[in-house]
Amino acid sequence: MMNRRTFLIISFVTAVVFSLPNALFGEQLAPFKLYDTHGHFYTNEPDKYPFDASRARYGPERMIAKAMAHPMTPEVVFKFWDEVGIELGCGVQYNSTYRTDNSYLLDISAKYPKRIIPIVILDPVDQATPGTLAQMAKRNKIAGVRFTGVPDKKTGSFIFMTDAAKGAWTAANDLGLVIVLMPLGPMQPAMKQVAEMADRYPNVNIVLDHIGFPDLKKAPDTFGLLPEHLVLASRRNVYYKYTTLLMEMVMEANVPLKDFLHFMTGVYGADHMVWGTDIGNSEVPLKEFVQMAIDSADGLTLKQKKAIFYDTAKAVFVPGGRGPKHTD
């Protein structure tokens, strides 16, 4: 019969083993470590973590049904990560399930700090947000915050990149936090505002979700990059996220993924590219898409591949922030 001491030892060892990445045990799809910058976590415990799916991509009913039937808990996500050789990744707060209630993400990232690096969602114009960012950086070791939305109907500006959000941006700049941006709608004005914010807040590393949604039909010669996308290459604090969702868009346009990634790498540099699976959101065979992402890097140097799939993300997403920028 197992005594309490033996049970506790077994439980502890099991927890430690579960928290370790697959690089120590199983197969890998690439001969280098992977860092997933775009993982969404949610659970089917609405009594403890209430849903707010009012802005879900496919509607609240479908989102809640999906979360209840197929929760994206650490157990589920880690199993997938281990299958493909992902060492760690960003837990990106999922607007479709919890909006700005980051409770679940912060609870699981506290439990698994070596595998989940939290990126929260907060109201960019709320006066409480600057203080909340400082508190979360210190207490919860967040690496950044994510802002998304459509432009204002009257001004055409994205409010999270205006003076209305100055407090949040200033706090992130002081703390050295990442701001992940996913503007929705017309990309020309959005990318202009991104350039302005990059200049104004040089200690904020801006990460563009889905590389700012290149318009492959509008600008086929530049693989969808508009002049406003291209000019961002001169801003060294802007980074670009190559994701499963973006890969779907590229494939739908009948553009070879390899050609697309090579062009993006040529424009922005591998040291400014990161990669993410979009697990929890994209409804595709993810293991196949991970392999396709890796294969699309064929022809790049090993150093470039490591940068895109691990090194850049590890340098950019710093738990707790990088701190204030020091100038000599």
Predicted regions and their residues:
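Conserved, mostly hydrophobic/aromatic
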Residues: 38, 81, 105, 172, ...
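Active-site environment of divalent metal-dependent phosphoester hydrolases
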Residues: 42-45, 96-99, 125-128, 152-154, ...
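Short aromatic-enriched loop/helix-cap "lid" or pocket-rim segments at secondary-structure transitions
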Residues: 46-50, 103, 131-133, 194, ...
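Short, electropositive alpha-helical surface patch
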Residues: 103-115, 198-204, 259-266, 291-298
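Catalytic pocket-lining loop regions of alpha/beta-barrel enzymes
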Residues: 143, 158-275, 323-327
